[in-house]
Amino acid sequence: MNARLAVAPTVGLRARRPLAPLPAAADALGGAPSAPSSTASPATKLYPNLDLDFVPVMTPAEWARGLALAVFTGALHAAFVAKLFTQRLTGGSSPWYVTVAPTLAVAVLTFAIHRYLALEEKEQRRLVSETDAADPDSLFTNVDDVTVHYKLRRPKKGPPRVVVSCCHGFGANTYSWERCAMSPLAEALGAAVVAHDSPGFGLTARPTDLSKYLPKTNGAISRAMLDVASVAYQSMEQRTVPQSPFPKPRRVVMGHSMGGIAAAVAAGAGDVDDVVLVAPALIPPRLGVKPNLNPNPKPVSLMTALCGALGRFATAVAVYALAPFLKLFLRKIVRSATFWRRGLSKAVGRRCAPVFFTDLTWADGYRRPSCVKGWDDGMVRVVLAAATAGVNDVWAAESAKVAAAMRKESPAVDAPEDMSTDAAATLEALRCSGARVLIVHGDEDAIVPLENSRRLADALGPEAQLVVMRGCGHMPHEEDPDVFVEAVKEFVGEWNPRPTVRAKKP
């Protein structure tokens, strides 16, 4: 392996500072939240103004109306069948099963529709806007026609020497960074640290354009957050000023899990000094092989390209057709505290699992977006974009492969711009960007295998460094932020000497 490898020990779980619940209000410019509690109760409410456990139920009057509608429509259907289909077609009475079975089906369907509409009305009434669900330290800005929610932390003293943009993983939001890592990173690096919600998650807007949910858009947002962080030391009223009187700080992008794809895309566009990938999902486990970074790969056969085009187009159609059912399924699981407690406890290492399961504030931090209007539509669009990249984008990409196969050329030659978010092209752009890469991975990660990061570090070459955190699972920056911050500080500090040293030079 060409990359450097380091193994970070894990300190005792009980001694860790960040296991205390995060207060709803924190100082956006000053760094750490004020007066955090040292213990967390399972009954602690992180967002007392939001009804995270709301479950819509029908009132007795609504039940009565539903049953009455079911009986009425069933009777109408029975009369319709008896008169139009039986007497006119056969001249006699119909068997009971010809009338009763369809009538019952119509009655049940009518009641189901009534129940859905009644519960949907209650569901929509309890949802709030992104700004109503925001924290006092929440900030919003517009990037590429998307209103992006983000959190900001900066060092308590002096202008930032480093600016950091953090991208969360699938199903998460800024909470995964702000609870444990943002303030310590700001102090350790002397950095302005920004974490944003990706489109479809958290409190960021959920546009109808599926291209806004692709990694290229999230990468553009990550780069925009670097610009926001660059002027973070100014007053909040002047944070949008495009220029700073201070020298340009070092630019760092971080990405956890699927957020690592956005971080890699952001760095691949250039003007990024360091990249920190935390349990990155850049190389899917199903591939089982090293990514092909050859800019001129072996041409794809015509049959393979055609099958791929038809397969992805069929997938797009199927996902669109199943979207309403997917929304109902997401509502069932995402709002459940039990779902998050079990999921988070399985995602982390063995020693952290009891804390993530018993402390309800962790689950609340992840499921808060389920109180925002349109959150389920956003999740469906995320899945649609991931599965199809949009029907038009799928067809364009696969058509390019077919055309290249017919010419017996490399598909990479004529691939559209969206194909740059493919793993191979993204990694190639990252490798050629000149940015140094730190990969942090827990040795108990059950979601993204550690071997994936080993192969990724090997593929990126000597500029990549792999740090393995013992006893951590898929979320090492949340499980052991002290060790994580120390690893990042050592990595960034190698090329970022303190400004006081540089100031002494004439």
Where are these regions (language model features)?
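Flexible "cap/lid" subdomain of the alpha/beta-hydrolase fold that forms the substrate-access gate
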Residues: 91-98, 102, 114, 213-215, ...
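Catalytic active-site module of serine/aspartate enzymes centered on a nucleophile-bearing elbow/loop
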Residues: 454-455, 462-506
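Conserved HGGG/HGGXW glycine-rich cap/lid loop of the alpha/beta-hydrolase fold
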Residues: 146, 152-205
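Short beta-strand/loop motif that positions the catalytic acidic residue
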Residues: 439-441, 445
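An N-terminal hydrophobic leader/cap segment in hydrolases
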Residues: 90-140, 506
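Conserved alpha/beta-hydrolase "acid-adjacent" motif
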Residues: 446-452
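Active-site loop/oxyanion-hole signature of alpha/beta-hydrolase fold enzymes
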Residues: 59, 154, 189, 195-254, ...
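Gly/Ala-rich beta-loop-alpha elbow adjacent to hydrolase catalytic centers
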Residues: 255-259, 263
